[in-house]
Design a protein with these regions (language model features):
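C-terminal ends of transmembrane helices
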Residues: 28-41, 88-97, 148-155
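Membrane-helix boundary connector in multi-pass membrane proteins
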Residues: 92-105, 116-135, 152
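N-terminal signal-anchor/start-transfer transmembrane helix
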Residues: 10-38, 143
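Membrane-helix boundary elements
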Residues: 40-74
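Small-residue-rich transmembrane alpha-helices that serve as helix-helix interface/gating elements
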Residues: 131-147
C-alpha cells in the first residue's frame, strides 16, 4: 500500500475506511437485532460503539487537515463527529423519542448527518482504492437492506 495519496496520509484514509465500514456493520446489526429481539436495547448498546468510532475518525480528520489534503478527505470525519454529538445528545444524554412518533425536526437532521457522513467518509476511497471502495459499497448496501427489513417489520 502507499504511504500517501493525493497529499493525504494513507493510514488516515484506511482509518476512515475502517470507521465507515464498522459503522455500516454495527448499524445493520442494530437494525436486525430489533427484528430478532423486538427491542432496541442491542441497537442502543451498538450506538455507543458507533459513538466511540468518532475518536479514530477525528484523529484521521486532524491528519488530513495537517497534511493539507483536499476538503473531501476531512469532511466525512467532520460530519460524522457532528452526527455523533447529535446522536449522543438525543439518544443518550437527553433522550428524545423522535422515531416513533416521528418528530421530523430531529429525525431529518439525524438521518441527513448519518447518511451524509457515510457517503462522505466512503467517497474518497473511490479514487484511492477501488477494491476497498467496493467493500464500503457492499457494507452500505447491507446497511440499507437491513434498514429496509426493519422498516418492513415495523421496528426501524
Amino acid at each position: 500500500m502507499q504511504g500517501a495519496t493525493n497529499g493525504s496520509p494513507w493510514w488516515a484514509a484506511l482509518t476512515v475506511w475502517g470507521v465507515v465500514n464498522a459503522v455500516n456493520l454495527l448499524q445493520a446489526a442494530g437494525f436486525l437485532s430489533r427484528i430478532v429481539t423486538g427491542s432496541s436495547s442491542m441497537n442502543h448498546a451498538l450506538g455507543r460503539l458507533i459513538g466511540a468510532l468518532a475518536i479514530p475518525a477525528l484523529v484521521a480528520m486532524i491528519a488530513f487537515v495537517r497534511s493539507q489534503a483536499g476538503w473531501l478527505y476531512w469532511t466525512g470525519p467532520a460530519v460524522f463527529a457532528v452526527f455523533v454529538v447529535f446522536m449522543l445528545f438525543v439518544d443518550y444524554i437527553r433522550p428524545v423519542a423522535f422515531r416513533s412518533p416521528v418528530r421530523h425536526g430531529i429525525l431529518v437532521p439525524y438521518l441527513v448527518l448519518f447518511f451524509g457522513a457515510i457517503l462522505l467518509m466512503g467517497l474518497p476511497m473511490f479514487r484511492l482504492n477501488r477494491t476497498l471502495w467496493l467493500v464500503t459499497a457492499a457494507t452500505t448496501a447491507f446497511l440499507l437492506v437491513s434498514m429496509g427489513i426493519a422498516v418492513r417489520h415495523g421496528v426501524a
